[in-house]
Amino acid sequence: MKKLMLKTGIIVATLLISISGMAQTLLKQDVQIFPAPEKGMVKYVIEVPHAGIAGDSNKKIEFFAGKYMDTDACNSYFLSGEFEKKDLQGWGYQYYVFKTDGNVGMTKMFCQGEKKNTFVPAQSIMTEYNGRMPIVIYAPEGYEVKFKIYKAEPETYQAAAVAVKSTK
């Protein structure tokens, strides 16, 4: 009897894990509906776990494109370029195309020392966190896409009111 209960428990646990994995897979949108990358471009996909409506609503995603370059230790570097938001016709989804001329700006401090290989990003985009939909980004070959996830804490804070003096 104990063996039968143990086998039944193992089977049920296996089924639950399988169903859970299938549900997570089914929630994600197939990225094949997005256009194939044009020549010289790479398609990047950001997929994040779905945390339910309440869990997703208090998060944001910041993503940025850039490339690794030899830089000095004391100047700040930034890549020129911007993201263009496009609509996936017939689906109601959006995707982003990163466009750049490859120019890099920097501060002009005098630095001595070794060069180091650093990721130099362009201006970032902040968007809603949605664990059910991937974020699709196209960037030129030689560039990479990175992202950060921001999460709001449940605490809220009161702003201070400022009294205005009368001018009478």
Regions found by a protein language model. Name each.
Residues 18-19:
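N-terminal signal peptide c-region/cleavage motif recognized by signal peptidases
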Residues 41, 91-93, 132:
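Extracytoplasmic
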Residues 1-10:
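Bacterial N-terminal signal peptides that target proteins for export
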